[in-house]
Amino acid sequence: MDIVKVCPELHIVMDVDSGLIAEMRKDILVVDLHPVEDEINKLAQYAKALENSLDPRNSPMKAYNGREGTYKLAGMFQGMFFGFWVTMAILVLVTILAVKMNLSLIGL
């Protein structure tokens, strides 16, 4: 919101956006909210990107074209990775338990 002082001696100003001419008062503070609105729009864009990241079919916000399904692929590999290590831990525990129960398996 821009204002122009039409007559500084009489404290008369004009609003550039609306063309309204009015008396300038000292008890009213005029604040430009365009920077705040820009920040709110940026936060809304980030919120939309976060919401889209919950759907594995969407691509990340600043990804190159053709990156749809990145989250789906990452989720699949994450499940395979942790599944492998959990299976290996269970296998080691079963092996240790089997050896403890029957020591003849290792020749003792």
Swiss-Prot record:
Any one cellular-component term (Gene Ontology): plasma membrane
Disulfide bond sites: none
Top-rank taxon: Archaea
Pathway annotation from the record: One-carbon metabolism; methanogenesis from CO(2); methyl-coenzyme M from 5,10-methylene-5,6,7,8-tetrahydromethanopterin: step 2/2
GO biological process, one term: one-carbon metabolic process
Keywords: Cell membrane, Membrane, Methanogenesis, Methyltransferase, One-carbon metabolism, Transferase, Translocase, Transmembrane, Transmembrane helix
Membrane topology: Single-pass membrane protein
Catalytic activity: 5-methyl-5,6,7,8-tetrahydromethanopterin + coenzyme M + 2 Na(+)(in) = 5,6,7,8-tetrahydromethanopterin + methyl-coenzyme M + 2 Na(+)(out)
Keyword Transmembrane helix: yes
A Gene Ontology molecular function term of the record: tetrahydromethanopterin S-methyltransferase activity
Subcellular location: Cell membrane
Keyword Nucleotide-binding recorded: no
EC number: 7.2.1.4
Regions that span the bilayer: 79-99
One Pfam family named in its UniProt record: MtrB
Function: Part of a complex that catalyzes the formation of methyl-coenzyme M and tetrahydromethanopterin from coenzyme M and methyl-tetrahydromethanopterin. This is an energy-conserving, sodium-ion translocating step.
NCBIfam families (UniProt xref): methano_MtrB, PRK00965.1
Homology family: Belongs to the MtrB family.
Record text on subunit structure and interactions: The complex is composed of 8 subunits; MtrA, MtrB, MtrC, MtrD, MtrE, MtrF, MtrG and MtrH.
Name of the protein described by the UniProt record: Tetrahydromethanopterin S-methyltransferase subunit B
Lineage: Archaea, Methanobacteriati, Methanobacteriota, Methanomada group, Methanococci
Gene from which the chain derives: mtrB
